[in-house]
């Protein structure tokens, strides 16, 4: 399964990793590699919990660009 992940700067120099198609699935790391490893683990746990709860594994992602 391939899922989108967003990386962005967090507090204290951490990199935040978030999977936008799984509500609340977020992690962080001191490096991009650590953040990606941590979000992979978080995704596995989130999918397991959603499956056990009978929830859809992922939600649709609708990306749009906004001009400002």
Task: List each model region and its residues.
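Short, charged, surface-exposed hinge/linker loops at domain edges
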Residues: 1-4, 37-68
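A short, exposed loop/beta-hairpin motif centered on an aromatic-Gly-Thr core
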Residues: 23-32
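Short aromatic-glycine-(Arg/Gly/Cys) micro-motifs in beta-strand/loop hairpins
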Residues: 8-22
């Amino acid at each position: 399964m391939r899922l989108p992940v967003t990386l962005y700067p967090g507090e204290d120099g951490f990199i935040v990793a978030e999977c936008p198609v799984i509500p609340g699935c977020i992690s962080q790391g001191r490096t991009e590699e650590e953040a990606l490893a941590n979000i992979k683990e978080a995704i596995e746990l989130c999918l397991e919990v959603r499956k056990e709860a009978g929830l859809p594994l992922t939600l649709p992602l609708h990306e749009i660009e906004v001009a400002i």
